[in-house]
Amino acid sequence: MIQPQTHLNVADNSGARELMCIRIIGASNRRYAHIGDVIVAVIKEAVPNMPLQRSEVIRAVIVRTCKELKRDNGMIIRYDDNAAVVIDQEGNPKGTRVFGAIARELRQLNFTKIVSLAPEVL
């Protein structure tokens, strides 16, 4: 469960290392975001000499959360960290690689480019 002021790791090579959630996109008063939700975030830590800089406001899609995700078949998935992938306005990833495992639910939410870049889909 991601809410405003939550810090997230970045799971791609876009140049950002750490994000802080500012807003959850989709509803005016939603409190929490889960896997597959799009958020507005600010870059708190960035790699030097990359296109994305610190204090830049960007959009990102959540790919991993510490809070468990329950599937319809009863399986529960939980990750060790909260992570997101930086996306542009059309929903395409800004990076060319995705690090770590991501959930299968992203494929149903039309983030197929992120799923194809991921090394492991759970």
UniProtKB/Swiss-Prot annotation:
**Descriptive protein name:** Large ribosomal subunit protein uL14c
Q: Which family does it belong to?
A: Belongs to the universal ribosomal protein uL14 family.
* Primary site of residence: plastid
| PANTHER family, alphabetized | 50S/60S RIBOSOMAL PROTEIN L14/L23, LARGE RIBOSOMAL SUBUNIT PROTEIN UL14M
Highest rank taxon of the organism: Eukaryota
In UniProt terms, what function does this protein have?
Binds to 23S rRNA.
**Keyword set, alphabetical order:** Chloroplast, Plastid, Ribonucleoprotein, Ribosomal protein, RNA-binding, rRNA-binding
Q: Name one Pfam family in it.
A: Ribosomal_L14
One of its GO biological process terms is: translation
An MF annotation (GO) of this entry = structural constituent of ribosome
UniProt-annotated location(s): Plastid, Chloroplast
* Record's signal peptide: none
